[in-house]
Amino acid sequence: VRVDNPIQNYTVSPMRKNIKANVSGNQLSFAVDSAAYLLVKINDLEDLYLLINPKVDYQAQVSDKEIVNILSFGIDSTGTNKETEKIQAAIDEVSRRKAVLYFPKGKYYTGELYMRSDMTVLLADDALIMGSTDPADYQDKSLIRMDGVSNFRMLGYGTIDGAGWAGLRKNGAREFHLLYASNCKNVLYDGVVLRDPTFWNTR
């Protein structure tokens, strides 16, 4: 953990774990050998909560399903082009096939996406779904939208970025959701990082 100023004092809780840490200037380092929920206090800064979960092999969880690579739909993975329509077409097709839509390492720039039933979205560790900074790209004011969806999973250690502070707020977006779900059942999100919403992260 690195902070702006030299570290004068710190604690790593829960104390019963007796975690040994090293201080070098403005950096605090320590190791854990198992899953843990930790509270780190440094100087008079805000508390830092670390939620450390066991590494999950999400590929193994979908090994019995048909896996469809998003790149097979001719989608740009550099974040240069806005690919909303192509990504949505891929979602619709994979739902029809009751399969897994796989996003390999890359940046996928998009507007609002509507998830469908009977499918799994699997994000690689370095896969980033990056929201557009144009409010006009969000008809229903959400980046990931689920209405009446059932039997849906989004798995993996990738990231979904709502582009809130990245530009959407500056461009006039108000009360947008990063993830919105309504009247859904049997839905699971696991491992995925949801960051930088305009307003609500998950609703």
Task: Give the location of each predicted region.
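Extracellular/periplasmic carbohydrate-active domains that bind, remodel
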Residues: 1-203
